[in-house]
Amino acid sequence: MSGSGAAGAAAGPAPPAQEEGMTWWYRWLCRLAGVLGAVSCAISGLFNCVTIHPLNIAAGVWMIMNAFILLLCEAPFCCQFVEFANTVAEKVDRLRSWQKAVFYCGMAIVPIVMSLTLTTLLGNAIAFATGVLYGLSALGKKGDAISYARIQQQRQQADEEKLAETFEGEL
């Protein structure tokens, strides 16, 4: 049973990011935002570590770790010195957009909670924006007002027909 489950998972359909209707340019925008967020986290994290305040140092180390994780997930070719970089990137690609959004936004909020400074806010802004972009893709494309009104009209007609049938059945 475990062998068939592993074979089914390996031969499964395309990653959920494609199933959710992300266009190629939006996917690249999310990846670019992730790489830029990693660079901003790394630079701000280094500046944050140049202090004597322990919470600033902890936030700076967390930001550098965020930068590494963002690069590992969004641009594994930048981390080829890590043997498992491609494996991690493939697993992250299989995550749904809302899961990536929660993960990236959560990673970006932790250093801000540790040390609320301008450096941590600016350094984590792009990383947080990456999570927001993935969250927006999880919401998906919404229909226009005309098609929504048409669907509502069809539902209303179906409800009226059901109501008429129940009245006819009682008489």
UniProtKB/Swiss-Prot annotation:
Keywords: Cell membrane, Membrane, Transmembrane, Transmembrane helix. The chain crosses the membrane at residues 32-52, 57-77, 102-122, 125-141. Induction: Increased expression in stimulated cytotoxic T-lymphoocytes. It is a multi-pass membrane protein. Disulfide bonds: none annotated. It is found in: Cell membrane; Vesicle. Disruption phenotype: Viable and fertile. Results in lowered susceptibility to skin papillomas induced by 7,12-dimethylbenzanthracene (DMBA) and 12-O-tetradecanoylphorbol-13-acetate (TPA). In cytotoxic T-lymphoocytes, leads to a complete block of early cytotoxic granules (CG) endocytosis at the immuno synapse thereby impairing serial killing of target cells. Does not affect cytotoxic granules exocytosis and global calcium signaling, however increases latency of CG fusion and endosome recycling. Residues 1-31, 78-101, 142-171 are cytoplasmic. Residues 53-56, 123-124 are extracellular. Its main location: membrane. The keyword Transmembrane helix applies. GO terms for cellular component: plasma membrane; vesicle. Expressed in neurons in the brain (at protein level). Expressed in neuroblastoma cell lines (at protein level). Expressed in cytotoxic T-lymphoocytes (at protein level). It holds the Pfam family Cg6151-P. InterPro entries: TVP18/Ca-channel_flower. Belongs to the calcium channel flower family. In chemically-induced skin papilloma, isoforms 1 and 3 are up-regulated in the papilloma cells and papilloma-surrounding skin, suggesting they might be important for papilloma growth. Interacts with adaptor protein complex 2 (AP-2). Transmembrane protein which mediates synaptic endocytosis and fitness-based cell culling. In response to different stimulus strengths, controls two major modes of synaptic vesicle (SV) retrieval in hippocampal neurons; Clathrin-mediated endocytosis (CME) in response to mild stimulation and activity-dependent bulk endocytosis (ADBE) in response to strong stimulation. In cytotoxic T-lymphoocytes (CTLs) facilitates calcium-dependent endocytosis of cytotoxic granules (CGs) at the immuno synapse. This is Calcium channel flower homolog.
